[in-house]
Amino acid sequence: VVSPGPGRPIDAGISMSIIESFAPVIPILGVCLGHQCIIEVFGGEITYAKQLMHGKTSEMAHDEQTIFKDLETPMIVGRYHSLSASEDHFPEELTVSAKTMSGEIMAVRHNVYDTEGVQFHPESIMTSEGMQLMANFLDTTNRRKV
């Protein structure tokens, strides 16, 4: 898990180099800043969010695959961020797997690697099915032969 934190991906220490090195080898889940790092590593751009979302909830629709398997859609997610993925500069290597009802990118999945990112916080009490999402990610890691 590449965890959340303050600032931009460029300020995230070794997070981006870890994603570059290990995405082909092991499952990775990026949360908030970790999600933004995944997007930048694969050629996308992070920009200012349409509005600040610190301690707020949103409804989010998802594709019901991998980490979203067996989760309600739409679901409520807890958000704590002021930056988000740019749709205009989104990398071809990634697929958008979830968006808010107003169209903001909330989750991405790599097209080849077991690498996923979520802009929201699954660990937040405000995220309705965060525990199951994390369990789904752990299932991915348990199935993977390293």
Regions found by a protein language model. Give the residues of each.
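Cysteine-nucleophile active-site neighborhood
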Residues: V2-D70, I76, M134
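Histidine-centered divalent metal-coordination motifs
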Residues: C32, H81, H121
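Hydrophobic/aromatic beta-strand patches that form the interior of the parallel beta-sheet core
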Residues: L29, T47, G78, S97, ...
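Acyltransferase
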Residues: I125-V146
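Catalytic beta-strand/loop cores that center a nucleophilic Ser/Cys/Thr
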Residues: T66-Y113
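Glycine-rich nucleotide phosphate-binding loop and flanking beta-alpha elements
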Residues: G7-R8, S86, M126
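Conserved hydrophobic/aromatic beta-strand scaffold that supports enzyme active sites
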Residues: T57-E59, I105-A107, G117
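Phosphate-binding/catalytic loops
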Residues: V112, G117-S128
